[in-house]
Amino acid sequence: MDVRFYPPPAQPAAAPAAPCLGPSPCLDPYYCNKFDGENMYMSMTEPSQDYVPASQSYPGPSLESEDFNIPPITPPSLPDHSLVHLNEVESGYHSLCHPMNHNGLLPFHPQTMDLPEITVSNMLGQDGALLSNSISVMQEIGNAEGAQYSSHPQMAAMRPRGQPTDIRQQASMMQPGQLTTINQSQLSAQLGLNMGGTNVAHNSPSPPGSKSATPSPSSSVHEDECEDASKINGGEKRPASDMGKKPKTPKKKKKKDPNEPQKPVSAYALFFRDTQAAIKGQNPNATFGEVSKIVASMWDGLGEEQKQVYKKKTEAAKKEYLKQLAAYRASLVSKSYTDPVDVKTSQPPQLVNSKPSVFHGPSQAHSALYLSSHYHQQPGMTPQLTAMHPSLPRNIAPKPNNQMPVTVSIANMAVSPPPPLQISPPLHQHLSMQQHQSLAMQQPLGSQLPMQVQTALHSPTMQQGFTLQPDYQTIINPTSTAAQVVTQAMEYVRSGCRNPPPQPVDWSTDYCSSGGMQRDKALYLT
């Protein structure tokens, strides 16, 4: 980038003399760059842009009409070599109107231009080298090595760039748009704090990005809280894990079968049995341990011939035991084969006896189809019983709407079930007798709800071409109350015919059980 410097023109007499800040040479303001108000920091001008003298007008607020009350920052208590750094810290930039330094920014004269207030947040948003260098300069004021680092830019770049905690807190508390002016008292207070607290940072051999080995109080407190919480959680989890473990059930010893042969004992055990009674008789107060010691000494004192007698007894007992064991195992195997056969043969009678239904085979499908179609046509009846629960017998039907509880007693039923779709004449005659009895018992009950004893409800036409018409035969019990169980018997009887219907050869048993095909109107045969 080409930077052109123009010779200083004649300064008008009306221009006020710019006071010098610090011992730095006070050069002419025309060599300084213009300040860009939008960017809030100094920037290099374009190569094609000419420098405008102070006598010419340029857009922006008038400088001559405004008064700038910038107090001179020259603390007398500080040494001379630190004044240069104070100017840099106050303005956020390095020495005024010098040639380009290592920061890459042209210095400027603060009193000849519209200089907005410098904010810490804007300093944080600028180049990292500018911020780190300015803060490191503040840290070096109380140290004797500060002059050496500031005189050499390469050493200043190698200098640690740790930020003090008070500067970080101040930068985090500032809002981006808040403007703060650094005066002498604030600067001296910050410098005093830095002089007392930041000397250790220069002697630490750790690199710039390394963390200190000693944790801060806040972090140590947080770690302690985390440890306590982990201990509490661990203490809570341990009982849960203990509770989750099932208590070990002691292994139950297998009960020995009394039929199982017992193992033979050794020769010494046989000798022990023989001599134990004699020793107990001589020493009744002797314990089992003392008796066993005496028996062991006697066994050692026996000769080989006496020992062989006991050994022969044990060998004979072993042979007998093996024979008995083989026979016992063979009996167990034979029982394991015969038990499942007995179970299988005993199951079919139970299945047959568990279904005491009147009709069998296709007639059950007829009853289910008839109930579903009938109650679909008449919504007054309760449709909950149309599913025909398996536990209910097939001869039970739901009660009509809001009638008195009735009980059905069907006597003299045939024990053996009739063939499908066939009703024996004695049964039909018995049902007709029950119908007449129910009509006779209904006459005195005129004040109660009317009850229809015989309901002609027709089912859809079957495959044979005739219609099944059921008769509801009910016998009213005068002593029945509302708490009694309500049952009704539904029997299928062909209207006008006592003979059983012929069963064709092409009858399909799956026809009626394929689903409840429902009709809107009942079909009648004329």
UniProtKB/Swiss-Prot annotation:
Residues 194-203 have a biased composition (Polar residues). Residues 261-329 bind DNA. Its main location: nucleus. Residues 209-220 have a biased composition (Low complexity). It is found in: Nucleus. Residues 228-245 have a biased composition (Basic and acidic residues). Residues 194-264 are annotated as: Disordered. CDD domains: HMG-box_TOX-like. Keywords: Chromatin regulator, DNA-binding, Neurogenesis, Nucleus, Transcription, Transcription regulation. Pfam families: HMG_box (PF00505). Residues 246-256 have a biased composition (Basic residues). Disruption phenotype: Mutant mice lack lymph nodes. The development of Peyer's patches is compromised, detectable only in some mutants. Peyer's patches are much smaller in size less abundant when compared to wild-type littermates. T cell lymphopenia is a hallmark phenotype of TOX-deficient mice. GO terms for cellular component: nucleus. Expressed in neurons of the subventricular zone (at protein level). Expressed in distinct subpopulations of thymocytes undergoing positive selection: double CD4-positive CD8-positive (DP) cells, CD4-positive CD8-low transitional cells and in single CD4-positive and CD8-positive cells (at protein level). Expressed in ILC progenitors and mature ILC subsets: ILC1, ILC2 and ILC3 (at protein level). Expressed in lymphoid tissue-inducer cells and bone marrow NK cell subsets. Abundant in thymus, liver and brain. Also detected in small intestine, spleen, stomach and testis. Induction: Transiently up-regulated during key developmental transition of immune cell subsets, likely marking a developmental checkpoint. Up-regulated during beta and positive selection of developing thymocytes, upon activation of pre-T cell receptor or T cell receptor in a calcineurin-dependent manner. Low expression is detected in precursor bone marrow NK cells, then is up-regulated in immature and mature bone marrow NK cells and later down-regulated in splenic mature NK cells. (Microbial infection) Up-regulated in LCMV-specific CD8-positive T cells. Expressed at high levels in exhausted T cells during chronic infection. Belongs to the high motility group (HMG) box superfamily. Interacts with HBO1 complex composed at least of KAT7/HBO1, ING4, MEAF6, and JADE2; this complex is involved in histone acetylation. Interacts with DNMT1, LEO1, PAF1, SAP130 and SIN3A; these interactors regulate chromatin remodeling. Interacts with an array of proteins involved in RNA processing and translation and DNA replication. The HMG box is critical for TOX-dependent CD4-positive T cell lineage commitment. Transcriptional regulator with a major role in neural stem cell commitment and corticogenesis as well as in lymphoid cell development and lymphoid tissue organogenesis. Binds to GC-rich DNA sequences in the proximity of transcription start sites and may alter chromatin structure, modifying access of transcription factors to DNA. During cortical development, controls the neural stem cell pool by inhibiting the switch from proliferative to differentiating progenitors. Beyond progenitor cells, promotes neurite outgrowth in newborn neurons migrating to reach the cortical plate. This is Thymocyte selection-associated high mobility group box protein TOX. It comes from Mus musculus. The gene is Tox.
